[in-house]
Amino acid sequence: MTRTVKFEKLIQTDHKLVFREISNFETYVSYVPGCSKAVLVERTDAYEVGKLEFNLLFKNYSITSKNYISDNKIKIEQIDGPFISFEGEWRVIKKDKNITKIIFTANFELPSLLNKLLSENSIDIFFKNSLEGFVDKLSD
């Protein structure tokens, strides 16, 4: 079963700063719940490959993704990880001089056991807390 999440947030921060922070996934340890390590594996002109490690539900997980970075968008494709499939996207939209809209969407399919353990609500809370942690970090 494919699940979809989408979150949007307006923040009072310059869009270039917001995009720079989102594209630096090595800082995700600072605000993504359960993320214990974030490493840049490879960088080319076309994409970056990164690995995030998590400790969730008393188990260690890692996800390696290929991230295609453009002017205001980052497309994320899982290369290896706990999902059967995962595609995500960050979009950063300049609304005004220091008003930025952040949009995160993801489509993913979990393995049967994780799918049974994780309710829609718990998944929504995880992604919402990640986005809020990111916004709080930018507000500091």
Region annotations inferred by a language model:
Residues 18-22, 28, 50, 76, ...:
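Hydrophobic pocket/interface hotspot
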Residues 107-140:
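A conserved amphipathic terminal alpha-helix motif
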Residues 1-45:
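Hydrophobic ligand-binding cavity/cleft-lining segments
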Residues 1, 40-47, 68-71, 95-97:
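Short, ordered beta-strand-loop transition motifs
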Residues 8-12, 39, 68, 91, ...:
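Generic structural detector for well-ordered beta-strands
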Residues 2-10, 47-49, 62, 85-87, ...:
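Intrinsic-disorder/low-complexity, polar/charged segments enriched in Ser/Thr/Lys/Arg/Asp/Glu/Gln
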Residues 55-99, 107:
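Hydrophobic-ligand binding "helix-grip"
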